[in-house]
């Protein structure tokens, strides 16, 4: 290959130009290391002093590592690795290198890339003597690539290109400095490889081109001299940019003595990734592109804990990366679920899910007020008449008029606990009906006033009231026909054995029939208007017992008439009437349904 053959020619040229005592590198033995002072004292008398600052150079080889078959040249001076512990930092900077040995013939060079550990040691003025000035200039000139367009300045001090990111510490500036013309110089780090890296693959940092060496040969950069501008060399259809912006800053290897002394020092080879392009030396444009090149140099690795990590590379923007970034920026959204509203049951069972009745009508009201439909289908005109009482207050309703007439005629007192006006008032009837304390769901005696009356083709719906409250009820249509002019709002009804219809514990209704009516105190009739109640007994029973019927029929009227006379006491007559009503209510119903039995018993003949 042309590139490797050029490197061989450069090596042969340098080896042939060397004096008899050639500089060779020998691997460190397992015995204890010598001190830097003793080691440098052995090296000092071998070569004349030079005023040029020199960095350790790694000479490239054209083949894979091989073992050294011939011993090193006679009279050669060996450089041994020295382990230096810095008192200021306390950390040991280690680097891997290769032992580079040159044969005396100069035709073929073999490098044994065996792992050895070397240190970068710093010496004072006159401690190290390098090659002759002219020979070193020739060696530098032969290693540069003319086609790449990158020509480092070769003055009395060799140029060195350093990454800008090496200047981390403001006190310890990591710029390359030029040795003084008086002859003071410093020794650069001697780079050797621990194990070879046979090939390098192109990455984004090198522009996609293979790099023949990942270890940079950095020289000292003269103070105040400008950094060479980046130049481009087209190789195999691609452009390789040679400049500081292509360098990936690595982990610098520095001499521990330079930390404590504060003198200008050289940055050693960097330890970037395999994609590092520090001081890339690409092939000339006339050379053919190389797919993969064996690495004559190996990237040294630093194990120091005080150096910084390599800079992160810019990620390649892909669709998957964009999706990941957008997914992290989004707020997590829960999957929309259809809201299932739990249906609450008003009571257990499927009927509890039925909707509410919006009309607000009770079943009892519908049963009472809705007329029955005739079988022929023709509906009669629904006639309703709602009449309300004209009195506005309880005192006006019950302090005068028919209510006062009824109390004075019967000599009743509402405050008396034994009077039926108190024991069977509307409040007490509703309470006993709810507690089911009414005998046979009937009220023995009761006096109520009509508050409102709603007439219909059937029975009339009435609202009854007394001084304690109000109660709903119905009036039979027979009473509406016989007492049409008397059944008006404000009239007082004296009732007995009134049935109470209780469809629920809260709803109770009075059913007034002709048999329940005792007397009506109306607004138009006056005090002397009395009504005879209907005959409670059947005709057959009345015919068989003619003496019983007048007594039963006349006794209520007699008690009411005696109430008009002051000398007579109504209290004595009323209990007898109440007892008679109680006896009649206790009679069995068969007593009224079998009139033939009474006649048979009266005559003494068997039935």
UniProtKB/Swiss-Prot annotation:
Q: Which residues carry this modification: Asymmetric dimethylarginine?
A: 281
Stretches of Acidic residues bias are at: 570-581
Q: What is its main location?
A: nucleus
Lineage top rank: taxon: Eukaryota
Keywords assigned: Chromosome, DNA damage, DNA recombination, DNA repair, DNA synthesis, DNA-binding, Methylation, Nucleus, Phosphoprotein
- Family matches, as InterPro entries: HROB (IPR028045)
* Localization, UniProt: Nucleus; Chromosome
A GO BP annotation: recombinational repair
Which Gene Ontology molecular function entries are recorded, alphabetically? single-stranded DNA binding
Chain intervals with Low complexity compositional bias: 295-308
Q: Where is the composition biased (Polar residues)?
A: 27-49, 92-108
Entry GO CC: nucleus; site of DNA damage
* Short name of one Pfam family: HROB
- For region Disordered, the annotated ranges are 25-49, 84-108, 196-308, 531-581
Please list the residues that carry the modification Phosphoserine: 30
For whether the record's keyword set contains DNA-binding, the answer is: yes
Induction of this protein: by what? By E2F1 and serum stimulation.
Q: How does it assemble?
A: Interacts with MCM8; this interaction is necessary for MCM8-MCM9 helicase complex recruitment to DNA damage sites. Interacts with RPA1; this interaction associates HROB with the RPA complex.
Its biological purpose: DNA-binding protein involved in homologous recombination that acts by recruiting the MCM8-MCM9 helicase complex to sites of DNA damage to promote DNA repair synthesis.
In Swiss-Prot or TrEMBL terms, this protein is called Homologous recombination OB-fold protein
Q: Which organism is it from?
A: Rattus norvegicus (Rat)
The record's gene field reads: Hrob
């Amino acid at each position: 290959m042309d590139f490797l053959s050029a490197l061989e020619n450069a090596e042969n040229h340098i080896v042939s130009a060397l004096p008899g005592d050639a500089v060779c590198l020998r691997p460190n033995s397992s015995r204890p290391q010598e001190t830097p002072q003793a080691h440098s004292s052995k090296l000092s008398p071998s070569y004349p002093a030079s005023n040029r600052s020199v960095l350790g150079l790694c000479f490239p080889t054209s083949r894979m590592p091989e073992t050294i078959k011939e011993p090193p040249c006679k009279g050669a001076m060996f450089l041994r690795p020295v382990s230096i512990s810095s008192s200021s930092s306390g950390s040991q900077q280690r680097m891997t290198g290769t032992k580079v040995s040159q044969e005396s013939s100069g035709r073929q060079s073999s490098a044994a890339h065996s792992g050895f550990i070397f240190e970068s040691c710093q010496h004072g003025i006159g401690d190290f003597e390098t090659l002759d000035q002219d020979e070193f200039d020739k060696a530098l000139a032969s290693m540069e690539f003319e086609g790449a367009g990158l020509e480092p300045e070769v003055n009395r001090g060799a140029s060195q290109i350093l990454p800008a990111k090496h200047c981390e510490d403001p006190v310890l500036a990591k710029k390359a400095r030029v040795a003084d013309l008086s002859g003071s110089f410093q020794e650069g780090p001697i780079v050797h490889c621990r194990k070879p890296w046979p090939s390098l693959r192109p990455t984004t940092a090198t522009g996609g081109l293979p790099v023949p060496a990942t270890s940079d040969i950095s020289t000292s950069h003269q103070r105040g001299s400008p950094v060479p501008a980046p130049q481009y060399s087209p190789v195999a259809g691609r452009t390789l940019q040679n400049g500081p912006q292509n360098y990936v800053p690595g982990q610098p290897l520095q001499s521990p003595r330079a930390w404590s002394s504060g003198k200008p020092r050289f940055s050693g080879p960097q330890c970037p990734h395999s994609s590092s392009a520090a001081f890339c030396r690409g092939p000339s444009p006339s050379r053919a592109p190389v797919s993969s090149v064996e690495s004559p140099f190996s990237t040294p690795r630093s194990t120091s804990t005080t150096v910084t990590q390599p800079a992160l590379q810019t990620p390649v923007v892909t669709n998957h990366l964009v999706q990941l970034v957008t997914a992290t920026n989004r707020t997590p959204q829960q999957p929309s679920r259809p809201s299932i509203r739990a249906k609450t049951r008003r009571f257990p069972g499927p009927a509890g899910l039925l909707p509410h009745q919006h009309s607000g009508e009770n079943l009892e009201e519908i049963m009472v007020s809705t007329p029955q439909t005739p079988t022929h289908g023709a509906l009669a005109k629904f006639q309703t008449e709602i009449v309300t009482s004209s009195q506005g207050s309880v005192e006006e309703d019950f302090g005068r008029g028919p209510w006062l007439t009824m109390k004075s005629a019967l000599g009743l007192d509402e405050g008396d606990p034994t009077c039926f006006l108190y024991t069977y008032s509307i409040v007490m009837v509703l309470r006993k009906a709810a507690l089911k304390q009414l005998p046979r769901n009937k009220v023995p005696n009761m006096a109520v006033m009509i508050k409102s009356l709603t007439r219909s083709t059937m029975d009339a719906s009435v609202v009854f009231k007394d001084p304690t409250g109000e109660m709903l009820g119905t009036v039979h249509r027979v009473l509406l026909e016989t007492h049409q002019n008397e059944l008006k709002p404000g009239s007082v009804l004296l009732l007995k054995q009134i049935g109470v219809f209780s469809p629920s514990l809260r709803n109770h209704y009075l059913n007034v029939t002709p048999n329940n009516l005792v007397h009506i105190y109306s607004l138009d009739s006056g005090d002397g208007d009395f009504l005879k109640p209907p005959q409670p007994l059947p005709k057959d029973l009345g015919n068989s017992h003619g003496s019983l019927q007048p007594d039963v029929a006349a006794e209520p009227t007699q008690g009411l008439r005696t109430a008009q006379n002051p000398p007579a006491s109504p209290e004595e007559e009323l209990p007898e009437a109440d007892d008679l009503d109680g006896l009649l209510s206790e009679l069995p119903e068969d007593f009224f349904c079998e009139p033939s039995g009474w006649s048979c018993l009266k005559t003494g003949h068997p039935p």
